[in-house]
Every structure is written in C-alpha cells, then in structure tokens.
Amino acid sequence: MKTTIILILLTHWVYSQNPTSGNNTATLCLGHHAVANGTLVKTITDDQIEVTNATELVQSTSIGKICNNPYRVLDGRNCTLIDAMLGDPHCDVFQYENWDLFIERSSAFSNCYPYDIPDYASLRSIVASSGTLEFTAEGFTWTGVTQNGGSGACRRGSADSFFSRLNWLTKSGNSYPTLNVTMPNNNNFDKLYIWGIHHPSTNNEQTKLYVQELGRVTVSTKRSQQTIIPNIGSRPWVRGQSGRISIYWTIVKPGDILMINSNGNLVAPRGYFKMRTGKSSIMRSDAPIDTCVSECITPNGSIPNDKPFQNVNKVTYGECPKYIKQNTLKLATGMRNVPEKQIRGIFGAIAGFIENGWEGMVDGWYGFRYQNSEGTGQAADLKSTQAAIDQINGKLNRVIERTNEKFHQIEKEFSEVEGRIQDLEKYVEDTKIDLWSYNAELLVALENQHTIDLTDAEMNKLFEKTRRQLRENAEDMGGGCFKIYHKCDNACIGSIRNGTYDHYIYRDEALNNRFQIKGVELKSGYKDWILWISFAISCFLICVVLLGFIMWACQKGNIRCNICI
C-alpha cells in the first residue's frame, strides 16, 4: 500500500512540473472560411478544384421574346425584306420604314410575279444594313414603249399590278425601240438602283411582249457593267406563271452616271434607295416582340448581356456576349474550399488552415481561433479579407473588357476575308467560334488560377505577420497554429489580431515558461523511467494479489490443484 501511494505521488509530481497544464499558455490558430458544398472550377493545373464561390460566365438561356427597347425592332410579319423593298402589294405598309433590326418570319411569303435574285444574300445584307426603305422616284424617260406592265399574279386590290418600285416595259404598238437612258448622281451619297430582266416561258410570249426574238439589258456605270440576256423557257408554275423575273442592282457613287441600254425584256427602276451606313441588321426569328429592355437579341429571343459569353445562338444583334461552344464556364470568386472536419481528436482541439477550413466563420474570409484561460473564441481578420476581395472584385468586368477588345479585332479581320472569299465564310465562322471557345476556357482557367493563388497568398501573409509579431514568445505548432508561452487573455489575443501586440511586454514570462517546458522535455527520459517502473510494479502487485487469491482458495478447498508426476 505504501509503495502504491509513493508511485501516485511521484506521477503527480512529474505532471505538475509541466507548465502547459495551467493557465500560463494559450493556443492561437489561423484559418480561412469554408463551405459544406463548394463549386468546382477549372484552373491551369487542375481540371476540377473546389472553391467557396464561383460565378457562371456563360449565358445559356434567352427570355423567349425579343425586346423592342433600346433598339427599333421592325416586325416583317408576312413580308421578307426584299419583298418590302421591291414593293410587293401585300407589303405596301413597309414603304419608307426605318429599323435597327428587321425581323423576318418563317411565315413570310411573296405575293407577286415570281422572281429570283442571283445574289439574294448580298442584296438583303445591303438593304438591311442601310436600315431604311426610303425611296426617291426619278424621272426616267422611256420613249416608244408601254410602261407600268402588270400581271394577274400580282394583284393590288382587284386589279392586275406589279412591284411598286419597278416599271415593267413592254412593246408599244408593234415596236420596241432600243432604249438608251442615263441618270447622273449629283448627290453626295450612294444610290441603290433595283432593276430586272424578264424571262418569258415561250418564244411566242417573247415576241408578243417585246417584238424581238431575243432581248438584251445592259446597265453600266463608270466602275461596272452588267449585260443580261433572257433565258426563254418554261419553268414550274407559280401563281399562274411559268415565266420569271431576275432582279439585279447597281450602286451609283456620287459623280457617277447610271446608263441603261435595252432592246427588250427590261424591268426598269423607278428611282433609287438612299444608301446609308450604320449598324442596322436583319434576323430570322419567330420569337414574339414585346415591350421590354435588352441590349442583346438572338433568334431565340433577347438575352442578358451581363456575362462575357453565351451559348444561346451564333447569330446576335447588339451588345452581346461572345458565342462559345461550352455550356458553362465558372469564374472563381472565392478561395480554395477545404470543408471542415467534423471530428478532430477525442478532445476536439482547434486546428489551423493547413488542416482544413472553418465553416463557422461567416464574417470574413480569414481569421483566428484561440484557446486561453478565458475559454475559446473566434474572430475574423477584416484587413486580409478586404485585401483578397479587392483583388477579386472586378474580375468579371476585366474578362468582359478583354473579350470585347480581342473579339472586335478578330471580327473585323474575318469580315474582310468573308467579303473577298465567300466560299470561306462558313469555315471562317466556325474557326472563329473554335478560337473563341479555346480562348475563353484558357482565360477563365488563368483567372481561376490567379484567384486561388492570391487567396492562398493572403493566408500565408497573415500567418507570417502573426509569426513576426509573436517572435520568440510563441512556437509554431504546425498546421497553422501557435503555442503562446505566456498568459494571453482575450485582450492579448485582440492585440495580436489588430497588430498592436508588443512582444517585449510578455518576453520574460514567455522565456521562463519556455525554459521550464523545455527543461521537462529534456528530462523526458526520467519521466519515462518512472512511468515504466510504475507500470511494472502495478503488474507485479496484480500478480501477487492473483497468486494470493489462488492460494487462499486452495486452502479453503474451493480450488483443487492436482500435480501428477
């Protein structure tokens, strides 16, 4: 019994020599916030890395309708732009209209004499970009022919009619003289003249309308000349007609002259359209037009333009995000996410940023957790938090600025290529999209890498700042924590947080405690010997008690032990 008491006293004395068992020390850990479920983003080095927060950069849906503000959107309804320009009777309501964006519907149809335009897309684009159907009639003199020809295929009201912007010339009496007409451009703007040639379905129709068996139309300026000969022959019937009209156009520059020479089959201009330069355009869409505001329009409907990229449609009008192939690209706007471990040892010790993040810290990105004589606590470090936020704020705007600047340069260059080599138009467009899709992914990956690196750097800066403050008064425990070798109450912890900690005040106390602790650590062999001796004696006493019990039981006859030799 005396031996046991002595061992207990010795063990108590050994542990009582450890200064850390009292209120003379504190533990301070640095960490960053975390969330239970982060967002995966892509960086240069990782395809998937979890961050606390991220912003989607790709607009993937439209609002389902076309907004009529801030752009003037003109609904073509049942008319195509070309029919409205030519003056198809059912499109008369569009005469002299203006637009920023002309919407062509899939339900649009022609309701006049059947025609074709050899380069339909180019004429459509020229008129669309002009943004107006403003027309000026001119006094062409057509001598010896009959003007204002009409057709039952093109009725205006109950009467046979024709395109209102064209003048169909046929024979007068039994003659069709050669026509030579000139029209100078004395204005300071370009004039667009629309004219055509009629292709009869039979030779009989040719001579019946124009006398000559084969007509000819030549339209010239100082810069160009077009000579067209009619192709006589039957074609599929359209609105009761097997003949056709081919539509052409000529642009006359200021100071130039329009010359028309024909001996038959001429569909003459009545005047000109004033050419204008601007940002007007045309779009095929069946989306409804509504009263709302959106600066970006696609055939699917208007879309918000607060993101740098979109995956809704390649065709856009206005200030729109750039089209890319990816459905999603996420820009990291938070730090690397390391969810907090729910179980950390049997004593629930606090841990620093090396081990994991802290989900409970909601008032800042970086902060402190401490354990001292007054208990435990947590506080955010607003300065380092603000430093990180300031660097991340504006990333989205910078991405938009970079994409806009680069895109306009590429778009201008590609437009020149498309204008010269029409066969490369689709190839160039696809290449442009591929290029931007790659650039977008690379740009976002670079920005995400930068965000994660800078937020990690702010954590390290805070750790180094704290270490420099504490100096020899504390020891780095690893894992982002410090063991402070002096009594550090909440006010002391607060001074460390706000940078006013004076290590000289606590230096002597810290050194004294550190030496005591280190002294015990240096004599750890002595403590270990006592523990081993205590363990051995305890085992010996247990064996003695067990042996005494067996002998007592044998004497009482409760246990019989037979030994056979």
Curated annotation (Swiss-Prot):
Palmitoylated. In natural infection, inactive HA is matured into HA1 and HA2 outside the cell by one or more trypsin-like, arginine-specific endoprotease secreted by the bronchial epithelial cells. One identified protease that may be involved in this process is secreted in lungs by club cells. The keyword Iron does not apply. Residues 551-565 are cytoplasmic. It comes from the Viruses. The record marks 344-345 as: Cleavage. Pfam families: Hemagglutinin. The chain crosses the membrane at residues 530-550. GO terms for biological process: clathrin-dependent endocytosis of virus by host cell; fusion of virus membrane with host endosome membrane; fusion of virus membrane with host plasma membrane; viral budding from plasma membrane; virion attachment to host cell. Belongs to the influenza viruses hemagglutinin family. Major glycoprotein, comprises over 80% of the envelope proteins present in virus particle. HAMAP family: INFV_HEMA. Homotrimer of disulfide-linked HA1-HA2. This is Hemagglutinin. It comes from Influenza A virus (strain A/Equine/Romania/1980 H3N8).
